[in-house]
C-alpha cells in the first residue's frame, strides 16, 4: 500500500473528519513508505517497548515551588525521553486512542515518527488534523479521551503519554520555525465573518483562510483566544503559547476586530450584510446561577470574572477589581463551589494568590466529579481541601463571612445512571469564608435578544439550533459552532466543530458561486 492509500485507509475508518482529508494527503507526502497490515502501520523495531519501558511523564515541579507562580507545572520532554515514551505505543490495529479523540488525530502515526526522531514529519501529521496541537497537548483531559482508552493502559502497562508528546512535537516545531503563517495558493473574493475568537472560531478561520477566503473575526475582548486567553490559568496554558498562535493567524491574513461587542458596537445584520457567510462561535459566558439566600453578598463572585482578572494581571494589565481585593484571594479564606475543570482552575489560582485556606465544595464524591482527576490530584498536592458531598444552602454577612453548607449523600441513579445527591436533614454547618467563587458551569446568552436578530432559532437550553454535522442554522448563510451549539464542553470539541463548520461554509460558498454563474 502506498503513502496515499495509507491515508485513504485512515479516512475510510473515520469518514467524518471533513476537510482535513486534503491536509492528510499533503502530510502523506512527507512520510516514507512503511509496510502495512490491515490498513495500519506495522510496528517496527523502535515500537512496542511498553513491556520494558515504563510510563514516565515530564518532570512535575514540586508543589511548594509551583504554587508560587503561574508558570506551567510540567517541564518539556528532552528529545531522548520523548522518543522513548513514544516507542511504548503498541501500534494497534484498531487505535482506540484515535477513535476516542474528537478530532480523530492520527496518534499512532505521529508517535511512531517521534520514536524514530522524525519530528518534522510528526508535526506535519499532527497539524493535519488539529489546528492547535500545542494547546490540546496541554489542556485536553487525556485521561478521559485518548490516554484513557489506550490499549496498553487496559492491559495494565500504563498509557502512552500522548498529551505530553503532542505538546513536545509542536513546541519543537515552533522552536525550529516549522510553523508557518497561512499562505493560500490563491486568493478568493468571498468573505466570511466569524463572531468569537475562541478555539472554535479560530479553527474555522484557519481552515477558511487556507482556502483563500477573506476572514474577519469579531470578538468582545481586547485579545483573541477567548477562554484560552482569559479563562484558563497560565499554570495550565501559558499565555505566550496562545499569543504565538494568534500572531501566526494574523500574519496569515486573518483580520481581527477586537473590543467589538456585537449588538452594541456593530449589529449582527451589519456583519451579515458585509460577508458572504457568517459563523457564530461565541462560546458560553453566562455563569450558571446559584439560587441561595445571600448570593448577592459582597465577596460572592463568578468564576469567569475571577479568572479573567487573574489572567489580565498576568498580561500586566491594570485591573481595578483585582487591585482593590474584590477579585484577589490574597490573605483570604476561599471557598469554591463546583466540581468541574473551572472549579479546579479557581482553587489552584487562589492558592497562587496567597489565600490562607482554599476549600472546594462539591455535592457528589470524588469518583463522580466531572473534572479531570489529574487536576484534582494537582490541586490536592498544592494544598486545596476538598469537601465532598456538600452543597451551599446560603451565605452569611453583607460582606460574605461564611457559607451555609448542607451535607449530602448519593441516592438513586438518574436516567443517565449517575447517582443523584440527596440532602441529609439536620446536617447544616457554617464554612468560614471571605471569598466565595461560583464555578457551577456556563450557559448561553440570549443571542436573538442580545443581538436584536429575528429568525435565529435556539433550543430550549438557549443554545443556537444548528445541524451538528455542518453547523447550519435557521438563517441562510449563517452557521454556528462550538459551545454555543453543544453547550459548555471541551476545547477539542470546539476545534472539531469549527473545522466542520468551515468545510460546510466552503460548500455553501461554492454552491452559491455556481448558482450565480448560471
Set out the residue ranges of the language-model regions:
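Beta1-alpha1 glycine-rich phosphate/pyrophosphate-binding loop at the start
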Residues: 44-75, 104-116, 126-127, 154-163, ...
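Immediate flanking context of iron-sulfur cluster ligation sites
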Residues: 76-96, 119-145
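FAD-binding core/adjacent interface of flavoenzyme oxidoreductases
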Residues: 110, 135-138, 143-195, 211, ...
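Conserved beta-strand-loop-beta-strand element in the redox core of flavoprotein oxidoreductases
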Residues: 261-273, 397-428
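FAD-site-proximal beta/loop scaffold in flavoenzymes
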Residues: 296-331, 413-488
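Long hydrophobic segments that form regular secondary structure
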Residues: 330-364, 429-435, 442-443, 462, ...
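A conserved FAD-binding loop/helix module that cradles the flavin
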Residues: 346, 484-509
Amino acid at each position: 500500500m502506498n503513502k496515499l492509500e495509507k491515508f485513504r485507509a485512515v479516512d475510510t475508518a473515520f469518514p467524518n473528519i471533513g476537510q482535513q482529508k486534503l491536509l492528510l494527503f499533503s502530510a502523506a507526502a512527507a512520510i516514507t513508505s512503511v509496510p502495512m497490515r490491515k490498513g495500519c502501520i506495522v510496528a517496527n523495531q523502535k515500537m512496542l517497548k511498553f513491556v520494558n519501558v515504563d510510563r514516565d511523564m515530564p518532570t512535575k515541579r514540586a508543589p511548594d515551588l509551583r504554587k508560587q507562580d503561574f508558570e506551567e507545572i510540567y517541564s518539556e520532554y528532552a528529545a531522548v525521553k520523548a522518543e522513548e515514551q513514544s516507542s511504548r505505543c503498541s501500534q494497534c490495529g484498531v487505535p482506540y486512542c484515535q477513535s476516542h479523540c474528537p478530532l480523530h488525530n492520527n496518534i499512532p502515526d505521529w508517535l511512531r515518527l517521534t520514536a524514530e526522531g522524525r519530528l518534522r514529519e510528526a508535526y506535519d501529521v499532527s497539524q493535519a488534523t488539529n489546528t492547535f496541537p500545542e494547546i490540546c497537548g496541554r489542556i485536553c483531559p487525556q485521561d478521559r479521551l485518548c490516554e484513557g482508552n489506550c490499549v496498553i493502559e487496559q492491559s495494565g502497562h500504563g498509557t502512552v503519554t500522548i498529551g505530553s508528546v503532542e505538546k513536545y512535537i509542536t513546541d519543537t516545531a515552533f522552536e525550529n520555525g516549522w510553523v508557518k503563517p497561512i499562505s493560500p495558493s490563491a486568493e478568493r473574493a468571498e468573505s466570511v465573518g466569524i463572531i468569537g475568537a475562541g478555539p472554535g472560531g479560530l479553527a474555522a478561520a484557519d481552515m477558511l483562510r487556507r482556502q483563500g477566503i477573506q476572514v474577519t473575526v469579531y470578538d468582545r475582548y481586547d485579545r483573541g483566544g477567548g477562554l484560552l486567553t482569559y479563562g484558563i490559568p497560565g499554570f495550565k496554558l501559558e499565555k505566550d503559547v496562545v499569543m504565538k498562535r494568534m500572531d501566526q493567524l494574523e500574519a496569515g491574513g486573518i483580520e481581527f476586530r477586537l473590543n467589538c461587542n456585537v449588538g452594541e458596537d456593530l449589529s449582527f445584520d451589519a456583519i451579515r450584510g458585509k460577508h458572504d457567510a457568517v459563523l457564530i462561535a461565541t462560546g458560553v459566558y453566562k455563569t450558571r446561577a446559584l439560587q441561595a439566600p445571600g448570593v448577592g453578598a459582597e465577596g460572592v463572585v463568578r468564576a469567569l470574572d475571577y479568572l479573567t482578572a487573574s489572567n489580565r494581571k498576568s498580561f500586566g494589565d491594570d485591573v481595578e477589581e483585582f487591585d482593590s481585593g474584590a477579585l484577589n484571594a490574597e490573605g483570604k479564606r476561599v471557598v469554591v463551589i463546583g466540581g468541574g475543570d473551572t472549579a479546579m482552575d479557581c482553587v489552584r489560582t487562589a492558592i497562587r494568590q496567597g489565600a490562607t485556606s482554599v476549600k472546594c465544595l462539591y455535592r457528589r464524591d470524588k469518583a463522580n466529579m466531572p473534572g479531570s482527576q489529574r487536576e484534582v490530584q494537582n490541586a490536592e498536592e498544592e494544598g486545596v481541601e476538598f469537601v465532598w458531598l456538600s452543597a451551599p444552602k446560603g451565605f452569611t454577612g453583607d460582606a460574605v463571612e461564611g457559607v451555609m453548607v448542607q451535607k449530602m449523600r448519593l441516592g438513586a441513579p438518574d436516567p443517565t445512571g449517575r447517582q443523584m445527591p440527596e440532602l441529609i436533614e439536620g446536617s447544616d454547618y457554617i464554612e468560614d469564608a471571605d471569598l466565595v467563587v461560583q464555578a457551577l458551569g456556563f450557559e448561553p446568552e440570549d443571542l436573538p435578544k442580545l443581538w436584536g436578530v429575528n429568525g435565529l432559532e435556539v433550543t430550549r437550553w438557549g443554545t443556537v439550533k444548528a445541524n451538528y454535522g455542518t453547523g447550519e442554522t435557521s438563517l441562510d448563510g449563517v452557521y454556528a459552532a462550538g459551545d454555543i451549539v453543544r453547550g459548555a464542553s471541551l476545547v477539542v470539541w470546539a476545534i472539531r466543530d469549527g473545522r466542520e463548520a468551515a468545510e460546510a461554509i466552503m460548500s455553501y460558498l461554492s454552491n452559491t458561486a455556481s448558482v450565480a454563474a448560471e
